[in-house]
Amino acid sequence: TGTLNTIVGGLAGDAMTTGSNNTFIGYDAAGAGVVTGNSNNCMGVGALRALTSGGNNSALGDSAGVSVTSGTGNVLLGHDAGRSGSPGGAISTANNTVVLGDENIGVIHVQVALTVASDERDKTDVVDLDLGLDFVKALEPVTYYWDKRSKYGDKYAEDYDLLAQTPDGTHKEDWMDIGFKAQAVRDLEEAAGYTAAAKKNLTVSLTSDGKQYGLKYEKFIPILVKAIQEQSALITALTDRITAL
């Protein structure tokens, strides 16, 4: 009984019932779920394959958004974007999430820096940050090589479980990366009272399927600024003491 739908491809939208204003292009696109959602757009074999009641989702690429069921407002670009093991994990019931590509993406090129919304008129309950020098001193920068769990086992199997995979070096990348261990940063944040349970995790994120931690590296900048300010105050105080001698 749906209206204003455009469906192109074998098995595309095969189980749709009341969904409206949807566009499904590609074999088995939105083909497995009983679709009641509206205003979804996908192109690619198996894109949005499990979609049910979700709406306003956009998926481009083979198997893009393959796990989405009731999630809404998601944008999934590239092969396997939103599948278990991809950077955002399995996007199923999550809302308003953007995922670019799968775990094989190695480089993103862009001409300019990202501009992130930060208008003070849109913020409330503003208080000074209390994470600074002590937090930074406790961080442990490391170098490492990726050996992704998602490259072990058959991630296309119905019963695939990322948590059951144990890397053994077989699929280790040959290039070095630099950063922090997300779980270690999580522990530091929690010790300071910034917990995910209270929705106060600052730099650490966990995918909606609970299987992969990530870090928001740009959010370390305010903490680093606070640390520099605290260190500058200490230097000024010591300089004043020396001058007074």
Mark where each language-model region is:
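Glycine- and small/polar-enriched repetitive beta-structure motifs of secreted/surface proteins
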Residues: T1-D119
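Intramolecular chaperone/auto-protease modules of tailspike-like proteins
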Residues: S118-L245
